[in-house]
């Protein structure tokens, strides 16, 4: 009688372990399984996959933090460290900052969401007139303000672009 109970318990344990291994196998991506493997190989691949995911999480966290620092710098528009002055400038009417960046020119345009912001197509037209080609554009809403961050490169390297003049032109736009 005791032997039969022991066999039944062992059979249930094996079935449960088989279902747990199947569940583990179903959670792993195909490139971590690679054909029919022993259970110890599957567990090792699961450990490798967990380590891989932990590395990716760390990399993405660092990337997120870097992007947040960049976006804060872009939003504030200056590196002089005068945070209060920058916030006051941005919280007023339309605000434009034009500066050089690695790829060419970066433009940060901020305006109230409720109206008065220049149309994006008008901004693109001005960039085209100055010989700039749009590379990247990000728009977001921050504290009831519409913020465009635009990166553009110079089409013709022979052209010298007056950043102050471009900034004034973008400020005058309605």
From Swiss-Prot:
Q: Which UniProt keywords apply?
A: DNA-binding, Nucleus, Transcription, Transcription regulation
- Stored CDD domains: bHLH_AtORG2_like
Which tissues show it?
Expressed constitutively in roots, leaves, stems, and flowers.
Q: Where in the cell is it found?
A: Nucleus
Annotated bHLH domain ranges read: 1-53
Family matches, as PROSITE patterns: BHLH
Q: Does Ligase count among this protein's keywords?
A: no
Cite the SMART domains for this sequence: HLH
| PANTHER family, alphabetized | ACHAETE-SCUTE TRANSCRIPTION FACTOR-RELATED (PTHR13935), TRANSCRIPTION FACTOR BHLH36 (PTHR13935:SF130)
Q: Any idea what this protein is called?
A: Transcription factor bHLH36
Task: Give the species this sequence originates from.
Answer: Arabidopsis thaliana
From which lineage does this chain's organism come? Eukaryota, Viridiplantae, Streptophyta, Embryophyta, Tracheophyta
The record's gene field reads BHLH36
